[in-house]
Amino acid sequence: MASEIFGIAVVFWVLIPVGLAGGALLLKLQGD
């Protein structure tokens, strides 16, 4: 059970920065 929680935490720690970086990149591309 602990491994499942750890896995979910890792997924969030990876997806959140990637999502923020992707959103910033899209805004920068739209700005141009």
UniProtKB/Swiss-Prot annotation:
The chain crosses the membrane at residues 9-27. Keywords: Electron transport, Membrane, Photosynthesis, Thylakoid, Transmembrane, Transmembrane helix, Transport. It is found in: Cellular thylakoid membrane. Its main location: membrane. It comes from the Bacteria. It holds the Pfam family PetM. HAMAP family: Cytb6_f_PetM. Component of the cytochrome b6-f complex, which mediates electron transfer between photosystem II (PSII) and photosystem I (PSI), cyclic electron flow around PSI, and state transitions. The 4 large subunits of the cytochrome b6-f complex are cytochrome b6, subunit IV (17 kDa polypeptide, PetD), cytochrome f and the Rieske protein, while the 4 small subunits are PetG, PetL, PetM and PetN. The complex functions as a dimer. Belongs to the PetM family. This is Cytochrome b6-f complex subunit 7.
